């Protein structure tokens, strides 16, 4: 009796799995277009500092869905002038000195804002060239991008919040930048013999062969941090 019940259960499961497979193969799922970047936050993009040369970056765009993209899509990308302001206020409120700043247009170039994704493909790359010469790298610079929507377009951007935009925090590096262990560095505050110990310090790029870091035990969120570089 038990063997019959087990056999019947296995047959039922096979029928259910077969039905599910047929259901998904015929599923009419909307193919939403989005950036492949972390959502609800800025995406830190680390790029090699190149003196007198652009620093290239390729941002992926993807077509979401449980079935393969079956049509040619031309995705229209633009500069998002609103989301960064909202993000800054939601995360830092009145601390405007901590705000990310929008990267001026003379420090980047985008060869083509229209990205083609052919049928049978679910991803394409958007080329961006950054130029750091003359940029104040003590600030946090962000390039905010958005996927445009219009009834005339043959695609729909992802409806979930933050999926159709990307906040690219541009962080250049050179051969000397990065995190350094500083446990041997003792900082003595005024009127005390007890040292303040900082475990690590991050060194930031100035140019191809130069770095800077904040002196002593200065925290990067202090309002006067620029005066102690």
Can you annotate each of these PLM segments?
Residues 4-11:
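Sec-dependent signal peptide recognition
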Residues 16-19:
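C-terminal motif of bacterial Sec signal peptides marking the signal peptidase cleavage site
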